[in-house]
Amino acid sequence: MRFKFPLMAIGLEVVMIVLFALFVQYETSVNTSRNPNETESAAMDVEKTMESYPFFQDVHIMVFAGFGFLMTFLWKYGFSGVGINLLIAALGLQWGTIIQGIFRSHGQKFLIEMKNMIHADFSTVTVLISFGAVLGKTSPVQMLIMTILEITVYAANEYLVFKILWASDTGESMTIHAFGAYFGLAVAGILYRSGLKEKHSNEESVYHSDLFAMIGSLFLWIFWPSFNSATADEAKKQYRAIVNTYFSLAASVVTAYACSSLLESRGKLNMVHIQNATLAGGVAVGTCADMEIPPYYAMIIGSIAGAVSVFGFKFLTPLFTTKLRIHDTCGVHNLHGLPGVIGGLAGIITVALEESDSTKTVSQAAALGSSIATALVGGLITGAILKIPFWAQPPDEDCYDDSVYWEVPERKEYDNHFHELLSTLH
């Protein structure tokens, strides 16, 4: 770890710098170099680009704060949850910028606009979702490799969906959420260890770790309308995406609370359900968020997604572990996979009702199938690569433990008092 990780991290960053030198330039660089007198035109381009900055800022907060804190629910893995999240996102946004730009420019130099940066953040979200499936069972070296491989596959599938099939997926329920979840599940299946079949002693949350994770959920919940509307190409579509996501999220919260109480003993609420299933409405409405659907349609989608997510955590996650040998640490299948599929199906139905030409409906269905199939194949290949012992995967007894890869402060006496106080509150 001492040499493998620094060498790989520095090597990858050097590669990124070289690729940026070869392919990337500011939006105004070409305009001013061709004609120095075209400063007004260049300024207008930048002004238009900057209109997207509030959306970029919201998405950026989701990536680094939302997903980061959501991963801190394990009581001895908080440093890695939020820290490796930062590492993945920082490397991923650079590689996402390059690989997506190369696809769209067909190998030529390309200009950086705010939309490029939003799409780069989107590409990192796929890896962060997959990270949730293998949380606590992989090394930082493995996550660097997975970041590069997954974003490459994601960019190829995204190009297929949007530039060849011409499907609609504004909030990317299919291309980000379903893709990221099933990619992660495929990797988790390959990396499955029978030694972790019985629940690990570190695979637990405590009162304060769940509170930190809930903060992450709130960041994601608040900014999700921006996520689903950031790449819409018209103001009216952005407006529809914001409104539909807003109400879909609200509906999923109410349904998630109700189903959690229904399924838990004595009607109590389960914090795992609340942290995750309350976000399912934002995932599920993404594909058709900008389409001309009434708000109640978005609320129905959100309600279904919230219920399905809770039932998934209660019944499917244990089934996946015991029967399919897929250990999904964060339950990404329930927050991103199933709601992503629901979003894809909702998009197919909406397009079928709106369009008289069946070609568009077929394209939507093909996009959903492509996203899942590409994710599974890419995940299986990536998992096989990550399984090579050289990448410093932690042994079973050291899983879900920060001290393997981090300098962790020793617990002081006041820490014990703090934990005792929390336990009394709990």
Curated annotation (Swiss-Prot):
**Record keywords, A-Z:** Ammonia transport, Glycoprotein, Membrane, Transmembrane, Transmembrane helix, Transport
Matching entries from PANTHER family are given as: AMMONIUM TRANSPORTER, AMMONIUM TRANSPORTER RH TYPE A
Stated name of the protein: Ammonium transporter Rh type A
**What is any one of the record's Gene Ontology cellular component terms?**
membrane
Q: What is the lineage of its organism?
A: Eukaryota, Metazoa, Chordata, Craniata, Vertebrata
Task: Give the bilayer topology.
Answer: Multi-pass membrane protein
Q: How does it assemble?
A: Homodimer. Heterotrimer; a RHCE monomer interacts with a RHAG homodimer. Component of the ankyrin-1 complex in the erythrocyte, composed of ANK1, RHCE, RHAG, SLC4A1, EPB42, GYPA, GYPB and AQP1. Interacts with GYPB (via the N-terminal); this interaction bridges the (RHAG)2(RHCE) heterotrimer with the SLC4A1 Band 3 I dimer complexed with GYPA.
Name the encoding gene, please.
RHAG
Glycan-bearing residues: 31, 37
